[in-house]
């Protein structure tokens, strides 16, 4: 008797938008649909915060590994064994599962989700295109860009954003200082190092604001320097998604001076609660969400003065702040309801048989070094790398 079709999601065990988006789709899927399994890949040499929230799944598997210390082939065999047998869909979200698919055939139709408008995801899509049956991109820009890179695959490239749940509590009108919020990894790509400069510009305009900064990362120390009043910023570090959701109702403006984004979840969640976004105007999913001047502001990336000017406009005109708050909430409620988007994902999964592409006869593994050989014992490879300090040129993510 043939096994029923099921869906297997493979993704990194990291706290962040990828895991939270997947968890939301799983939470809102139909109860009578196919079984869903999640395989979390956990590099024990990574310092990323693990995803601790529960997922509504029929099976949860964790695959731990230590790259670049281990033999890559041993890690890929371990991952392949964690994928439940049977037909259906394998949803790939990062490089490790695509590498696994290069040498192991799970017998499933493969969907690859590009979680951001970054070269990283586009490069993976192009490199592993023969193994991928369908691509999911989150933004209109991403759909067009990937279609230009892979014009022969345009019909199997789907623009399918993730949604967010409706906010449990809407933002309350503040009476004192404007309440500013930053949510994201503290690195230069997210613009965390620009926050103190924006605050200084606000002070020069006579505006005192209160900041809450959520996140951690390599730019944490730099982000904490240069504040006119260091006590005006509350640093919360990395927090779970549930904790972040509880913060939005107590803030007025979400400030995100990124230089690269996809479809930023923090913007969707904040707007759902009525928090007005002031975010970089990037050629990605930002304009899929924010209507400039109505539901938020889109300063030029890296332009501290424009960010401060937009925030100052809201601080000096609270009626405008309230109107934009309502518009932000309405925009997400109408276009990014997670229930609708979860149903769209289910409809795509249901097409697995018609979208299935036969596996190429010969596929090269694009990662690894001379020590990454299927016939070399993993223990030997780990010992040699520990002694010699040799690092394999595999992906570090």
Feature annotation, model-predicted:
Residues 291-293, 297-304, 313-318:
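Conserved acidic donor-binding segment of nucleotide-sugar-dependent glycosyltransferases
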Residues 131-168:
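Donor nucleotide-sugar binding/catalytic pocket of nucleotide-sugar-dependent glycosyltransferases
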Residues 276-280:
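Short hydrophobic beta-strand element within catalytic cores of glycosyltransferases
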Residues 259:
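Aromatic "clamp/platform" in nucleotide-sugar-dependent glycosyltransferases that forms part
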Residues 238-239, 246-251:
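Short alpha-helical donor nucleotide-sugar binding micro-motif in glycosyltransferases
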Residues 91-97, 114:
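Short His-centered aromatic/hydrophobic patch
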Residues 17-24, 178, 182-201, 218-222, ...:
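A conserved mid-protein helix/loop that constitutes part of the nucleotide-sugar donor-binding site
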Residues 223-239:
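Nucleotide-activated donor-binding/catalytic signature segment of Leloir-type glycosyltransferases, i.e.
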């Amino acid at each position: 008797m043939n096994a029923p079709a099921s869906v297997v999601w493979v993704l990194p065990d990291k706290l962040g938008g990828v895991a939270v988006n997947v968890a939301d789709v799983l939470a809102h899927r139909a109860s009578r649909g196919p079984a869903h399994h999640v395989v979390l890949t956990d590099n024990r040499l990574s310092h990323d915060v693990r995803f601790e929230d529960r997922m509504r799944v029929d099976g949860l598997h964790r695959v731990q590994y230590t790259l670049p210390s281990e033999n890559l082939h041993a890690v890929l065999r371990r991952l392949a064994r964690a994928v439940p047998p049977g037909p259906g869909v394998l949803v790939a979200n990062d490089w490790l599962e695509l590498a696994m698919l290069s040498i192991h055939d799970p017998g499933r139709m493969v969907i690859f989700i590009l979680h951001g408008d970054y070269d990283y995801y586009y490069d993976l899509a192009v490199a592993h295109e023969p193994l991928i049956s369908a691509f999911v991109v989150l933004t209109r820009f991403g759909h067009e860009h990937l279609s230009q890179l892979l014009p022969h695959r345009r019909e199997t490239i789907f623009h399918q954003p993730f949604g967010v749940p409706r906010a449990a509590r809407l933002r309350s009108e503040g009476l004192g200082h404007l309440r500013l919020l930053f949510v994201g990894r503290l690195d230069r790509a997210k613009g965390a190092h620009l926050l103190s400069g924006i605050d200084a510009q606000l002070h020069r305009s006579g505006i005192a604001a209160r900041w809450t900064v959520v996140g951690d990362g390599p730019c944490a120390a730099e982000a904490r320097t240069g504040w006119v009043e260091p006590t005006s910023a509350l640093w919360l570090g990395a927090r779970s998604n549930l904790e972040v959701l509880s913060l939005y109702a107590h803030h007025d403006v979400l400030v995100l001076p990124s230089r690269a984004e996809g479809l930023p979840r923090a913007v969707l969640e904040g707007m759902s609660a009525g928090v007005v976004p002031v975010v970089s105007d990037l050629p990605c999913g930002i304009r899929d969400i924010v209507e400039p001047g109505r539901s938020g502001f889109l300063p030029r990336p890296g332009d501290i003065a424009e960010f401060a000017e937009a925030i100052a406009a809201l601080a000096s005109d609270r009626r405008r702040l309230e109107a934009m708050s309502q518009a932000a909430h309405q925009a997400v409620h109408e276009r990014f309801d997670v229930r609708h988007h979860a149903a769209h994902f289910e409809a795509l999964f249901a097409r697995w048989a018609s979208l299935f592409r036969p596996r190429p006869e010969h596929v090269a593994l694009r990662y690894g070094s001379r020590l990454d050989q299927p016939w070399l014992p993993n223990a030997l490879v780990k010992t040699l790398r520990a002694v010699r300090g040799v690092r394999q040129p595999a992906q570090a993510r």
